[in-house]
C-alpha cells in the first residue's frame, strides 16, 4: 500500500477508520481512550489498522482521530504512521466519518470502506467478501442475523411485546459504498444538520442507496465496555505467547578531580577536598545513567544530545541531561522499571548520602524509591581511582516499552 501523499494512480478502494471517540462507556485508563488501550500487547487501533494495511485490496487508508490524540496515535502506530493519512475528527461519529471521506476527495477512490476503530478483529476473509460484493450502485453491509429473542418494553418497564426476529440483523463494519454517493449523502445530512444516523448504512438508506447485506463475522466484535477490552486482551494472550519489550541499557562515565570543595553525585552536593572536572557540573552518576536510559532507545549518548563543544552547557546541572533522556523514554511509551548506579571511588564515602541521592533520582525520573539502587565500591587502591585522581560510575537502566519483541 502506498502512502496517500505518494499515490500516483487513482485508488480503487480506500478505507476510512473512525477513531475519534472518547470511549466513555469503557471507563478511564492511563492509556487513553479505548482505541489506545492495549490488547495482546498492542493498541486496539494499531491492531485494527493492521488488518487494512495487510489487505492487498485496499489502496489507501485515512484514519480519523481526536485532535488531542496525535501523540497517542503516533505512539500506538510507530512504524506505520507514514503510510496512513491522519485527519482530525468532529464532535460525533457521523461528523468524523464525513471529514474522513472529504480527506479522500483528491484521491477519488471508486469505493470506500468505513470501519470502527474499535473493531480490531476484522478478518481478511470478511474484507475480501465485502469487496467481492461491491457494485457501482450498491453498498455492502456485513451483519449477523439476530439470534436472541427481542422484547419491547412498556413505559413502566414491563414487557409490551415480543418482536419477531425474522429478517432482523445486527449491523457490523466495515460498511462499503461507492465513494461519491456516500460522500454526497453525508454532505446532504450535514447541510441540513441531520446528525441522528447511527451508522453509514442508515445514511445510505436515507438517500435511497441500495445496501446489500452479507454475512458478517461473530469474531468482528466492537469493543464498547471495559469488560470487552479485558476479554479481547485475554483472548489474544491465550492465542499468542508474547515476549514483552523489556530493554536494558548500560552507561559508564569517569571524571578527574581538580581543586575545589565539593562534588555533585546524582544531584546531591557532597563536601569534599576536591571537585570533579567537567564541562557541566561533572555529575558522573547522572552522566552514566543518562547514557543508560538513552541506550534503551538506541538514541546515542549524552555527547550526541549535549555536545561538550557547545558553550550553553558550560556548568549546566546534569539534571537537565537525565530528564531529557527520561522524556525520550516516555515519549516512546516506555516505563522505567529500575535504575542502578555504582560509584567506583576511594572518597568521598557514598553511604551517608545514599538516601538523598535516591530521593533526588526519584524526583528526576518520577519513579518509586524501590526502583532505585545506588551502590559504591573502591578500586582496592589500584589505578587512577585507587590513587584518588577521580571517580567512575557504572549505570544500568531497565525500561519496559509497549508491544513485544518481534520474532
Curated annotation (Swiss-Prot):
Q: Where is this region: 2-C-methyl-D-erythritol 2,4-cyclodiphosphate synthase?
A: 247-407
Where, by residue number, does a divalent metal cation bind?
253, 255, 287
Q: Which UniProt keywords apply?
A: Isoprene biosynthesis, Lyase, Metal-binding, Multifunctional enzyme, Nucleotidyltransferase, Transferase
The annotated site for Transition state stabilizer falls at 25, 34, 279, 378
For binding 4-CDP-2-C-methyl-D-erythritol 2-phosphate, which residues are annotated in this chain's numbering? Answer: 253-255, 279-280, 301-303, 377-380, 384, 387
Biological process (GO) annotations held by this record are: isopentenyl diphosphate biosynthetic process, methylerythritol 4-phosphate pathway; terpenoid biosynthetic process
What does the record give as EC number? 2.7.7.60, 4.6.1.12
Q: Name one GO molecular function term.
A: 2-C-methyl-D-erythritol 2,4-cyclodiphosphate synthase activity
Q: Which cofactor does it need?
A: a divalent metal cation
Family annotation (InterPro entries): IspD, IspD/F, IspD/TarI, ISPD_synthase_CS, MECDP_synthase, MECDP_synthase_CS, MECDP_synthase_sf, Nucleotide-diphossugar_trans
What CDD domains does the database record attribute to this sequence? CDP-ME_synthetase, MECDP_synthase
Task: Spell out the residues of the site Positions MEP for the nucleophilic attack.
Answer: 165, 222
Is-annotated flag, keyword Transferase? yes
Map out region (2-C-methyl-D-erythritol 4-phosphate cytidylyltransferase) in residue numbers.
Answer: 1-246
The pathway to which it is assigned is: Isoprenoid biosynthesis; isopentenyl diphosphate biosynthesis via DXP pathway; isopentenyl diphosphate from 1-deoxy-D-xylulose 5-phosphate: step 2/6; Isoprenoid biosynthesis; isopentenyl diphosphate biosynthesis via DXP pathway; isopentenyl diphosphate from 1-deoxy-D-xylulose 5-phosphate: step 4/6
Q: Which reaction does it catalyse?
A: 2-C-methyl-D-erythritol 4-phosphate + CTP + H(+) = 4-CDP-2-C-methyl-D-erythritol + diphosphate; 4-CDP-2-C-methyl-D-erythritol 2-phosphate = 2-C-methyl-D-erythritol 2,4-cyclic diphosphate + CMP
Disulphide-bonded residues: none
Q: Which family does it belong to?
A: In the N-terminal section; belongs to the IspD/TarI cytidylyltransferase family. IspD subfamily.
Query: What is the role of the protein in this entry?
Result: Bifunctional enzyme that catalyzes the formation of 4-diphosphocytidyl-2-C-methyl-D-erythritol from CTP and 2-C-methyl-D-erythritol 4-phosphate (MEP) (IspD), and catalyzes the conversion of 4-diphosphocytidyl-2-C-methyl-D-erythritol 2-phosphate (CDP-ME2P) to 2-C-methyl-D-erythritol 2,4-cyclodiphosphate (ME-CPP) with a corresponding release of cytidine 5-monophosphate (CMP) (IspF).
Q: What name goes with this protein?
A: Bifunctional enzyme IspD/IspF
Q: What species is this protein from?
A: Brucella anthropi (strain ATCC 49188 / DSM 6882 / CCUG 24695 / JCM 21032 / LMG 3331 / NBRC 15819 / NCTC 12168 / Alc 37)
| Classification of source organism | Bacteria, Pseudomonadati, Pseudomonadota, Alphaproteobacteria, Hyphomicrobiales
Amino acid at each position: 500500500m502506498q502512502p496517500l501523499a505518494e499515490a500516483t494512480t487513482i485508488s480503487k478502494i480506500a478505507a476510512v477508520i473512525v477513531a475519534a471517540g472518547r470511549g466513555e462507556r469503557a471507563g478511564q485508563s492511563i492509556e487513553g481512550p479505548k482505541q489506545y488501550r492495549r490488547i495482546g500487547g498492542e493498541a486496539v487501533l494499531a491492531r485494527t489498522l493492521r488488518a487494512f494495511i495487510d489487505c492487498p485490496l485496499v489502496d489507501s487508508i485515512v484514519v480519523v482521530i481526536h485532535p488531542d490524540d496525535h501523540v497517542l496515535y503516533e505512539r500506538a502506530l510507530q512504524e506505520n504512521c507514514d503510510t496512513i493519512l491522519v485527519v482530525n475528527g468532529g464532535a460525533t461519529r457521523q461528523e468524523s466519518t464525513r471529514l474522513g471521506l472529504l480527506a479522500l476527495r483528491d484521491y477519488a477512490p471508486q469505493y470506500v470502506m468505513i470501519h470502527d476503530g474499535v473493531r480490531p478483529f476484522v478478518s481478511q476473509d470478511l474484507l475480501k467478501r465485502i469487496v467481492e460484493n461491491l457494485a457501482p450502485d450498491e453498498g455492502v453491509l456485513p451483519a449477523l442475523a439476530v439470534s436472541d429473542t427481542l422484547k419491547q418494553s412498556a413505559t413502566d418497564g414491563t414487557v409490551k411485546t415480543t418482536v419477531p426476529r425474522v429478517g432482523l440483523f445486527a449491523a457490523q463494519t466495515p460498511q462499503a459504498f461507492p465513494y461519491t454517493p456516500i460522500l454526497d449523502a453525508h454532505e446532504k445530512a450535514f447541510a441540513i444538520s441531520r446528525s441522528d444516523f447511527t451508522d453509514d448504512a442508515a445514511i445510505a438508506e436515507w438517500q435511497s442507496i441500495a445496501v446489500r447485506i452479507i454475512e458478517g463475522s461473530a469474531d468482528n466484535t466492537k469493543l464498547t465496555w471495559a469488560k470487552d477490552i479485558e476479554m479481547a486482551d485475554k483472548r489474544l494472550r491465550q492465542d499468542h505467547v508474547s515476549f514483552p519489550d523489556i530493554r536494558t541499557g548500560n552507561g559508564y562515565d569517569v571524571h578527574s578531580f581538580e581543586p575545589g570543595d565539593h562534588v555533585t553525585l546524582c544531584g546531591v552536593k557532597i563536601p569534599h577536598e576536591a571537585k570533579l572536572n567537567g564541562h557541566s557540573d561533572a555529575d558522573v552518576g547522572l552522566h552514566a545513567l543518562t547514557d543508560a536510559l538513552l541506550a534503551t532507545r538506541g538514541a546515542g549518548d549524552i555527547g550526541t544530545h549535549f555536545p561538550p563543544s557547545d558553550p550553553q552547557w558550560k556548568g549546566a546541572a546534569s539534571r537537565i541531561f537525565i530528564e531529557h533522556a527520561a522524556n525520550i523514554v516516555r515519549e516512546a511509551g516506555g516505563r522505567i522499571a529500575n535504575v542502578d548506579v555504582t560509584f567506583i571511588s576511594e572518597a568521598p564515602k557514598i553511604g551517608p548520602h545514599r538516601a538523598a541521592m535516591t530521593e533526588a533520582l526519584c524526583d528526576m525520573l518520577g519513579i518509586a524509591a524501590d526502583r532505585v539502587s545506588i551502590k559504591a565500591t573502591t578500586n582496592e587502591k589500584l589505578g587512577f581511582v585507587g590513587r584518588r585522581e577521580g571517580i567512575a560510575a557504572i549505570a544500568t537502566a531497565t525500561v519496559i516499552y509497549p508491544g513485544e519483541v518481534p520474532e
